[in-house]
């Protein structure tokens, strides 16, 4: 128990001789260092706030302006046009013996220079914002850049400093524009034309016209008004109504998973892998806090919004009866760990020092070696986060609002993130196709009680050292967690490394206090609620069919030879595969980002178009020449690319209609058109997984350093969820989900149709493939 006593700064006991105080120098040292570290963080935040506030200016540029003003004065040149003299006359008289005419003159010049500097910053920032409103570059053909775009790019570079911080561009990003109602309705009708017969389409046209003429103008005015004062007219409502107000389980329905590197393995030692990975994660968090991470830039010059990254760590979704809330802390010095039905609190720091990988390995090994059994009700406690939100909110209020249960729950909810240590082993074996699907299922839902689905993300560790993530969706979208994951995996492989036996480098400090077991007092009534939530979650998990596979014949290398966008190629293949699978077309959702705007998140690309359906029907007929099919395919691909660009530049369909619908609800206005649009099911929900956001290594030199992406559950009960990652020149990973309870869907069958569709389209271009 010596380590436990070190954690107490002082103790006192009352004896017949008086009060006996005992101080722990080591504990006091840690308290002191922790305080110093906290003040350092505050000072860094203040410094970054100042630097961010004056961007694209800098303290250096301020000094340059002052020196220019002072220098011109010494040369008897008044560049202020008399303003310095005016400021000098306005300064109060007799403010001390040191206020000589020279100091008054210098102070006046400093005030003038500061005013010029601030005015220049405002001008440059507004100019940069205007330049970032230009999106013509997105619609130009690859390799054919116009002179206007060249001039625009040169101006962007001139106004951007060479070393921007993570949030430097936030105030320069333009706001998401509100599209014209007529344009949105026109694009909507165009998107549903291939899905409706003539009679249904005519009825929808009438509904749309009635809405546009009678209801929409009033709703649009309120929406435009909101866009003037809000940072983003969509994002706050999207977070609240799509995510936080959802009452169904987060598991499968909302949370998504991310896979590890699957073609290489750095170590088989579970604790060692965790030591490196968690050390890398906290290094990333430190860079995030200090804003040292470079903002993601399109073309290397167009900044993407970094707002979502703020809540990556120290964030938990707190359940409520009507709506959940996101609780975000400025800092957290520990992680919560689950192993064999027990919860632990593991400190990440010793005083002000971040634990080294070998120390973290030792701490996790202590947890793995701990033989203590779970407390009553503890083993399946996390099932509360996997079940219904109302039941969890009621249980939280009834059983976790006081005493040791409150303290233990706070240790989890206030952790930097959650770590799950599994006893099973999962990995990808190319010789065993089912292995990737089993791995994905374990990440998506586990056994329904070994993940804390409310945390911003859960780091999942399998017995063989393989890892993965399960991420909550409300706080951010997949590219944000992907940015972290790329950094962590790259740091693990190329910077930290392992010994020959697979352990972390260096010797650990055995004097570290071991992780702390969280203590619970869970009554029988609460245990019954836990079991009920577990049964709900288990039924949901058992109904999910997940089929993951690596497509080996080709990747983006061959697709580029077909002179088309890789994303458009895959999306059209999905349309062909779906028609072969179901014999009909369906409303298709593809997620696109709107992060070129301030606080932008996503927009929907409706991938099922008249052009893509024409190509699919021609393929099914089998009577067209390859030249005709290629022409139809190129038209479909061009249409898809244009729709994707429109979505990225704020001219999408669904977010605008979603916000108009919410305004109608606030105003108590009934709209049959909006009600029907918002109730249409997405039977094919798709998403491309981003990669190479951080260039930590050359993929050509390390072709096996590939992650397999990740996936999510089906959006509709009778539909498919498809995510895909075009992982390299010669491979694509697919993750397909559906429900066993639907007689119309089968994930593996759909996967086979996708394979065949990709090969059939590639054959149209007669480009040799890696494998047949």
UniProtKB/Swiss-Prot annotation:
InterPro entries: Carn_acyl_trans, CAT-like_dom_sf, Cho/carn_acyl_trans, Cho/carn_acyl_trans_2, CPT_N. Pfam families: Carn_acyltransf, CPT_N. Residues 1-47, 123-772 are cytoplasmic. GO terms for biological process: carnitine metabolic process; carnitine shuttle; fatty acid beta-oxidation; fatty acid metabolic process; long-chain fatty acid transport; response to blue light. SUPFAM superfamilies: CoA-dependent acyltransferases. Residues 74-102 are mitochondrial intermembrane. Belongs to the carnitine/choline acetyltransferase family. This protein is produced by a bicistronic gene which also produces the CHKB protein from a non-overlapping reading frame. PANTHER family: CARNITINE O-ACYLTRANSFERASE, CARNITINE O-PALMITOYLTRANSFERASE 1, MUSCLE ISOFORM. This is Carnitine O-palmitoyltransferase 1, muscle isoform. It comes from Homo sapiens (Human). The lineage of its organism: Eukaryota, Metazoa, Chordata, Craniata, Vertebrata. The gene is CPT1B.
């Amino acid at each position: 128990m010596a380590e436990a006593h070190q954690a107490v700064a002082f103790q006192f006991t009352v004896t017949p001789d008086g009060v006996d105080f005992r101080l722990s120098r080591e504990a006091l040292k840690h308290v002191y260092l922790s305080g110093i570290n906290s003040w350092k963080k505050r000072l860094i935040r203040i410094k970054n706030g100042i630097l961010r506030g004056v961007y694209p200016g800098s303290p250096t540029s301020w000094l340059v302006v002052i020196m220019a003003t002072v220098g011109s004065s010494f040369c008897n040149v008044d560049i202020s046009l008399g303003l310095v003299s005016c400021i000098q006359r306005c300064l109060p008289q007799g403010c001390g013996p040191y206020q000589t005419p020279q100091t008054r003159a210098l102070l006046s010049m400093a005030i003038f220079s500061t005013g010029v500097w601030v005015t220049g910053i405002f001008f440059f920032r507004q100019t940069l914002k205007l330049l970032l409103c230009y999106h013509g570059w997105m619609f130009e053909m690859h390799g054919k850049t116009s002179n206007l775009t060249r001039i625009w790019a040169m101006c962007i570079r001139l106004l951007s400093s060479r070393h921007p911080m993570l949030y430097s561009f936030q105030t320069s990003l333009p706001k998401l524009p509100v599209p014209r109602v007529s344009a949105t309705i026109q694009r909507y009708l165009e998107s549903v034309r291939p899905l409706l017969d003539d009679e249904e389409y005519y009825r929808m046209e009438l509904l749309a016209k009635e809405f546009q003429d009678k209801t929409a103008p009033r709703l649009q005015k309120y929406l435009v008004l909101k866009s003037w004062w809000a940072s983003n007219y969509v994002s706050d409502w999207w977070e609240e109504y799509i995510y936080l107000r959802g009452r169904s389980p987060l598991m499968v329905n909302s949370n998504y998973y991310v896979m590890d590197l699957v073609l290489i393995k750095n170590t088989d030692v579970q604790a060692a892998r965790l030591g490196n990975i968690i050390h890398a994660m906290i290094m990333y968090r430190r860079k995030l806090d200090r804003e040292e991470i470079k903002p993601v830039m399109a073309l290397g010059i167009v900044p993407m919004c970094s707002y979502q990254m703020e809540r990556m760590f120290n964030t938990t979704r707190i359940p409520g009866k009507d709506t959940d809330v996101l609780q975000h802390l400025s800092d957290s010095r520990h992680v919560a760990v689950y192993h064999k039905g027990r919860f632990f609190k593991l400190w990440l720091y010793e005083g002000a020092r971040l634990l080294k990988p070998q120390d973290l390995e030792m701490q996790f090994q202590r947890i793995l070696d701990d033989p203590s059994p779970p407390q009553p009700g503890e083993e399946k406690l996390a099932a509360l986060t996997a079940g219904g939100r109302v039941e969890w909110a009621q249980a939280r209020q009834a059983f976790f609002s006081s005493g040791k249960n409150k303290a233990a729950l706070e240790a989890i909810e206030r952790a930097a993130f959650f770590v799950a240590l599994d006893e099973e082993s999962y990995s990808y074996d190319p010789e065993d196709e089912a292995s990737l699907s089993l791995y994905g299922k374990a990440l998506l839902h586990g056994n329904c009680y070994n993940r804390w689905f409310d945390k911003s993300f859960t780091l999942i560790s399998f017995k063989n050292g393989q890892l993965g993530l399960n991420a909550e969706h409300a706080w951010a979208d997949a590219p944000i967690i992907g940015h972290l994951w790329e950094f962590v995996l790259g740091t693990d492989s190329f910077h930290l490394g392992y010994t020959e036996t697979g352990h972390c480098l260096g010797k650990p400090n055995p004097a570290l206090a071991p992780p702390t077991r969280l203590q619970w007092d869970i009554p029988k009534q609460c245990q019954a609620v836990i079991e009920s939530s577990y049964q709900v979650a288990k039924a949901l998990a058992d109904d999910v069919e997940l089929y993951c596979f690596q497509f080996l014949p080709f990747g983006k290398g061959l697709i580029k030879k077909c002179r088309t966008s890789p994303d458009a190629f895959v999306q059209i293949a999905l349309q062909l595969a779906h028609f072969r699978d179901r014999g009909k077309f369906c409303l298709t959702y593809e997620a696109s980002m709107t992060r070129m705007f301030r606080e932008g998140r996503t927009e929907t690309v409706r991938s099922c178009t008249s052009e893509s359906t024409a190509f699919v029907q021609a393929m099914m007929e089998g009577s067209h020449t390859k030249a005709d099919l290629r022409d139809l395919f190129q038209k479909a691909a061009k249409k898809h690319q244009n729709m994707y660009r429109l979505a990225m530049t704020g001219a999408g369909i669904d977010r605008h209609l979603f916000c108009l619908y919410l305004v109608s609800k606030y105003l108590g206005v009934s709209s049959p058109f909006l009600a029907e649009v918002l109730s249409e099911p997405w039977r094919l929900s798709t998403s491309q997984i981003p990669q190479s956001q951080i260039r930590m290594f050359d993929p050509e030199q390390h072709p096996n350093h590939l992650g397999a992406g990740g996936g999510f559950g089906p959006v509709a009960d009778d539909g498919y969820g498809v995510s895909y990652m075009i992982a390299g020149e010669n491979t694509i990973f697919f993750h397909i989900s559906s429900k066993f309870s639907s007689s119309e869907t089968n994930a593996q069958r759909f996967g086979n149709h996708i394979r065949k569709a990709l090969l059939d389209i590639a054959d149209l271009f007669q480009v040799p493939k890696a494998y047949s």
